[in-house]
Amino acid sequence: MNIDSIVRELIGQASGITADSRSVKPGFIFVCLSEAAKGFVPDAVKAGAKFIVAGNAGGLPHVDHSQIIICPMQHDLYYKLASEFYHASQPEFVAVVTGTNGKTSVADFCRQIWCLTGHTGASMGTLGAIVGNTTLPSSTSFTTPDAVELHKTLSTLRDLQVKYLCMEASSHGMAQKRLYGVKASAAAFTNLSGDHLDYHGSMEKYWATKQKLFSEVLSCEGCAVLNADSEQYGELRELAAGRNIITYGVDTGDVKLARLERNTQGHNITVKVCGEVIYDGAFPVLGKFQISNLLCALAIVAASGSGHRDVPIDRLASPRGRMELIGDRIIIDYAHTSDALKHALTSLKWHGFPQKTVLVFGCGGDRDREKRKTMGMVASQYADVVIVTDDNPRSENPETIRKEIMLHCENAIEIPDRGDAIHYAVNFAIRNNYVLLIAGKGHETTQQIAGKSVEFNDGTAVRRCLSEMQYA
């Protein structure tokens, strides 16, 4: 029996689908996406699972054989079931953006632009699913949600009369086919640098995964939004041949800059689309790299047909935790790759902050260890004072992570507790007239330590410290 036949057989008999035994309810289909998941089959059956799907029969506990469906391509079946269960319902226009850095900002700028121009727009990704200014409840923290959560959210957005959506596509999400069944009206690419190599194994495999957005997800009638400034532009243009293509770039592209000035509050810019000036004024967002993200967002908006000529760019705001300015000298940014950290640090000088720079950062545990070296080197080269602290150590020994970073920035100050590190850095920066960058966690509201989720937010820690100092 092929996948389509199995879907037709099961979809009308099920009350829900999940790959998490803890989410099973009576009448659900429980899909074992890994061999380890078979160990939770008894829990799923006890909770009322009507069908059990597995890739093979090996290791399955004894259950009623009428409940078991064996499908060697159980991952594909899972995504197909998720799409069909929610009737492939989604907003009229869905743009999907991929790339190492910038995805969240692009999606957020798109949502802001659509809303500011009188449309019902939404974004979905690392910050959650946001409609207008309201974040929807979610059970996931993934950039690209699990297939069931994704299609459930898409269906909810449709029910809320959302017409335009821009969502992020992570490399994990692409590799695990979480976007199966999404009808992408546009696919956009930001940039490529090293990340998640612990998962993908090599830059070649990482890049190949990113390309799947254009070869497997973007519809034949869809639009490819390509970064003309990127090294990957030529390869992606060939991959997108036969589809509509909109290019963007600082110096060249259908959407490009004609003028750029910067200050400590952001930028003043002139933007052209196909040779026509569509905006001349302020862009009140910090970060030189945010210019490229804005241009990408404008290209997506142009592809959507919602209108790109009267966009109030001067009313755009930084996404939460993305070059977020607190007071006049403290910036919080999500930078968690060496490339992103370099861009964040160099942007401070580029914007004309006259002060020296204090940097607070760490690296995540159970993730690509090579980043500890490269981020340490960037910190040592571009920051005047470096404070190494804990990020999300997860199951690793935090001290080991810090030591591996400090091998490459020998003069760094080590303060294990992130709250203590921020308190020290805020006091140091204000008393010595430095500018402070706190990198790595951005908008996150928890810290993952030894299997526990501890409530913590960089911005909250900064504001508490400023309040104690009666500075703000």
Curated annotation (Swiss-Prot):
SUPFAM superfamilies: MurD-like peptide ligases, catalytic domain, MurD-like peptide ligases, peptide-binding domain, MurE/MurF N-terminal domain
TM region positions: none
Family (UniProt): Belongs to the MurCDEF family. MurE subfamily.
Meso-diaminopimelate recognition motif, short sequence motif: residues: 391-394
An MF annotation (GO) of this entry: ATP binding
Binding of UDP-N-acetyl-alpha-D-muramoyl-L-alanyl-D-glutamate, residues: S21, T143, T144, S170, Q176, R178
Residues reported to bind meso-2,6-diaminopimelate: R367, D391, N392, P393, R394, G440, E444
Reaction(s) catalysed (UniProt annotation): UDP-N-acetyl-alpha-D-muramoyl-L-alanyl-D-glutamate + meso-2,6-diaminopimelate + ATP = UDP-N-acetyl-alpha-D-muramoyl-L-alanyl-gamma-D-glutamyl-meso-2,6-diaminopimelate + ADP + phosphate + H(+)
Gene Ontology biological process: cell division; cell wall organization; peptidoglycan biosynthetic process; regulation of cell shape
Gene name in the database record: murE
Protein name from the UniProt record: UDP-N-acetylmuramoyl-L-alanyl-D-glutamate--2,6-diaminopimelate ligase
Record's comment on post-translational modification: Carboxylation is probably crucial for Mg(2+) binding and, consequently, for the gamma-phosphate positioning of ATP.
Residues where ATP binds: G99, T100, N101, G102, K103, T104, S105
